[in-house]
Structures are given as C-alpha cells and as structure tokens.
Amino acid sequence: MISQEPYPMRFHPLMKQTIWGGEKLSTLLGKPASGHGNDAESWEIVDHGDDQSVVTNGALAGSTLADLISQDPSWILGSSQTEGQFPLLLKFLDCNCVLSVQVHPDD
C-alpha cells in the first residue's frame, strides 16, 4: 500500500516522432523538441507496456504509473479498477499534414 496522501502529481511527457509530426508541440506548448521537426505526439499520461508516465514531483517522484497501480490500485484508480492498468492515454498531437483514419478496435 502507498502510505503517501494523494496529491496533484506531474508526469514527464513522452515525445513521439513520426513523418507527419511538426514543431508546434514545442513552440506552442513548450514541450521538449527533438530538433528534427517531426514531433508528432506528446503522451502526457500513459500506462502502456514499456511506455510509462514517470512522476516528476513530490514524495513519489521517479515512480511510474504502472508501479503505483501495482502497489495500490485503489490509490490511483479508486473503485474503477480496470485490469491493473490506467485506462486512458492522454496526449497532444501535432499533425503537420492530413492524416488517414486510424482505428484501433482491439484497444
């Protein structure tokens, strides 16, 4: 169990580059830039395999979201526990060109 009282946590964003990305995530939102002009996604909160949000502030700094959920699922998820992982992926996109429809029926 996590003995720490809940507090507003900040997470380090994960930056993803693609051929359709741009520079707006860094210029408009101040996100770290790769310097290649193809920064497409800033994953703000994620618990998906090896892609993990890491707490950057407070007593739990350095812990991943998956670590916190495995230690004490109800501390993060409350009574809405869903298969042991955080149920949402929160991200910003910079689509520097028109994209095709993307469907993820199994997710």
Predicted features and spans:
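Transition-metal
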Residues: 1-107
